[in-house]
Amino acid sequence: MKPNHSVNSIGDPINRVDGVLKVTGQARYAAEHTHAMPQTPLVGFLVASTSAVGEITHLDTSKAEKAEGVQAVLTHTNAGPLKAFSQPDDEGRFTQSRAVLNDSHIRHYGMPVALVLAHTLEQARYAASLVAFNIDAQPAQLLLAPDQATEVPESLDGGFEPDVESGVAPTQSATDINVDMQYTTPSQISAAMEPHATIAHFDGDKLTVYPSVQIVASAVQALATTLEMDEDNIHVKSPFIGGGFGSKLGLHYDAILACIGARYLERPVKVALSRRHVFYNTPHRGHSFQRMQLSCNSQGYLTSIAHHSAMPKAKGYTFAEATGAGARVTYHANYINSTHRVKSADTPLIDSTRSPGDAIGSLAFESAIDELAHKANIDPLTFRLNNMPKVHPVNGSRFTSHKLESCLQRGADIFGWQQKSNAKPGKVIGHGVASAMRMNVLVQSSANVAIDKNGMITVTTDMTDIGTGTYTILAQIAADAFNTSVDNVTVNLGDSQSPASCGSGGSFGAASTGSAVLKACEAVKSSLLSLLPEDYRDAQFLVTDKGLCVRQSNSEKIQETPL
């Protein structure tokens, strides 16, 4: 482990700058910000629907209201004004209304029917069991077979087109080798270590919210939309997040319920979902039906790739997973056809879940590639290497980078692929290879960087750290920019009053916000250089025991820089 006081630490396994806070319990997560509240927060516990879809016809909260410690029971009859769920429909999915307890309609199994507010969790949970309700259940619309998915989504997650067809479908010859495979994957849920939780507090018309959310800026917008408030009156803080994997990209019921409760009682409220609640009140990955049709010639060169995906889409929510995106770029083929079909279903939200699209799409695609290589009697590694694209297989554009070939070759060398023994007939134990492709995504981000005369650097942005090391990454970037160690860098994250970033998600966080931090560092250095004499214009900054210093190019002279 490289000591943190060394310089040029990018890429080195240094100690995480927030590590001590975490291992000593000083890093506060969403449900732990009670110290910042003017009163001890009341605890909210939700009452969950037992039907997948229908209308609430009867609701009796009288017994719950009389239970020990209970301060209020909120339902759609008294929760207060909220903009209808998923409105306005021209907004992005993370900024639309996330309304709950706003009408009698049940959209999915487990949806909150009521919220009990009490002094303790035990009191709230017991009182929740006393709430009586009836639901006029209706048949749920679900995706049970691929041919039921007939809707073409407007777009896919990541901005991909739902359907792509490139080249001309080849005429089959007698020597062509084909596979036509069906793959299914189950629905999946992130179930991060930290369940979704929120503490909310109103001070007059000012709302402060501590949620567990990956993108802070859109959380402010979603709260403003849902609660019909001015964004300037909302302050969101999310300094530490115990895992997200996409399930916390946007706000969910815990945040809205906490805000509704705080508004109703005019005191702080905490709502933390139980592990059971997480499974039907937060986003999940929908199950998939995938058909892979691949063809190659007798030499093992791909002639045709067809990837057809069918998945459910939550009603009132725009997300559709880009399952076939990988098949469009991983290997070269003369003909590529990729389609996506969905069915609007009465389910909890379906949204980005750990490596959306790629995780399940590459599973089907790479499995089919293996099947084709086996049928062609060609080594699966050789088969892949023979089909590396020189340009984008669909649009012909030049890749910024496409490192799959070198990755496979390096992996084969480390693994000793050439020395492997073939599996014996009838045996299922052997060696294999598979590829995974994740497109590089950059999203607009901003950051503020300040440095004082002692060389102490402060980085401020609303970027979040979901356990991926953002605090350390940004500290390393700033430290390297000024030729100092991360010990001289303070990073402030997760506050909506800071410059807006991309947030964490889609594997774009470090690259996008890291670039913003680097640009801000360069701007600071440029401003400082403009104050120096002409012969220092090509100088370098560094931090010594004298504080912030400047060194002339090609010179050993070090001179303190006045700030």
Q: Which residues fall in each region the model found?
A:
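Structured beta-strand/loop patches that form or line metal/cofactor-binding pockets in enzymes
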Residues: V269-Q290, A434-M437, Q444
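Glycine-rich loop/linker segments at domain edges
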Residues: D12, V17-G25, D89-G92, F160-T198, ...
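Stable alpha-helical structural segments in soluble proteins, enriched in small hydrophobic residues
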Residues: A114-A118, A124-A128, T226, I256-P268, ...
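Flexible, low-hydrophobicity surface segments
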Residues: M1-D157, M181, D254, G326, ...
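Extended active-site and interfacial segments that coordinate phosphate-rich ligands
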Residues: V17-L21, G44, S129-L142, Q221, ...
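Helix-loop-helix junctions that connect adjacent transmembrane helices in secondary transporters/permeases
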Residues: Q148-L227, N387-M456, F541
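Short, surface-exposed loop/turn segments at secondary-structure boundaries that line and modulate
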Residues: L74-M111, S218, V236-L257, R276-R291, ...
